[in-house]
Amino acid sequence: MCKADDIDRAVQAANEAFADWREVPVVERARVMFKFKSLLEANYEEIARSVSREHGKTLDEARASVQRGIEVVEFACGIPSLIMGESIENIARNVDCETIRHPLGVCVGITPFNFPAMVPLWMYPVALTCGNTFVLKPSEKVPLTSLLIAELLIQAGIPSGVFNVVHGGKEAVDALLTHPLVKAVSFVGSTPVARYIYETGTAHGKRVQSAGGAKNHIIIMPDADMEQTVQALKASAFGCAGERCMAGSLALPVGDAADMLVPQLAQSASRMKVGRTDTGDNVDMGPVITADHRKRIEGLIQSGCAEGAELVLDGRKVSVPEAPDGFYLGPTIFDKATPKMTIVREEIFGPVLSVVRVNTLEEAIAIGRDCPYGNGAVIFTSSGRTAREFKHHFNAGMIGVNVGVPAPMAWFPFTGWNNSFFGDLHIQGRESIQFYTQQKMTMTRWFAPSKSKFQDPIWKPKS
């Protein structure tokens, strides 16, 4: 684990490399990303297997996450056409104005355990192509995949010192947040830590984008295609063992939709196979990340029972004989939960779905507006009018219609609201380019050589 002096060496190396890297033409920096993308694709299966081994995802889930990361590298390859400024010729007589974007310097990424490849790739390909240098601190729970990918970046031609990986806990984080040479910090993780990252980083003069936790609402209207809804909701709630910030953790069936949804979903989820993801067996869910995390989830399940929710499917009863000491939980479903219950208010970050029955769309939207988070929300409906009302009124940054998860896409910003995000410019999309650069306006005037008298640049209307 890195100490403060190790962090300082990494930041110093990045700062020293910045002077040369920023002067490399942006098209040449993009060519490094093209090579990097090719290497990621060539080593796709090895990276996915590393993710699966480290985190416990199924191999298919790991593959999907790696592909999402590669798409950000693909986006970064196009930065030369996206980083262009604006100009006005003759804004005054013989005066031209233009804007250009400059890199910031040393940027930092602090990333979570749940997506060891994808989330870091949300950050540094864009930062590097914009001309910055980078220090990545991945979660100490999943240290290896980041190093595997870093080796590919070196093979792609990234110069020494431009990209650095450090490992550590809070001491390492604090050293990065307070280091005077660090200009910007990107973070993805829980809301308490996201708030700490934002407050500490900005207090020390950093530009910060800090993505926190979520409680994603899924509204099911009576006119929804129930078969499609059940399959999408099952994948949303229990995919990646629920360890993702876009997991669908709260279902809000409207009217009699609940009587159709709950039994079908419980029956389908009960057939999901939970087990080891490293044996080649076809399983639907792997373990959660640690024994402590499983204990926390079990405590929240117990709170749901104690507060009066109806436990329809109990994932604590799952058995994995080939790994009796593994950190396994099966799909868990609560019905007839109420908005003030702990399982409804708190992010669980595990395979637990709570169902709150409502009478109208307006009631579902009101519950969403009362939620302290605002990452994502989804509606299942066959009505365009209903979908439009939902999109317009629901209080969240990522909205889906008839999709299980409004997944973050490389070309669009990951727009969390409320306590799901702290900062001004979001991760991914064009906003990420704005985050990793600063804008300069230049005003240029050239005098006409044949004129000897003063040439006033101020535009004056004719009298």
Predicted regions and their residues:
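Residues at or immediately preceding the N-termini of alpha-helices
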Residues: A4-I7, V26, Y44, L59, ...
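Short, structured beta/alpha segment
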Residues: M1-R49, R53, V358
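Long amphipathic alpha-helix in the N-terminal Rossmann-like dinucleotide-binding domain
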Residues: Q12, F34-E45, L59-M84
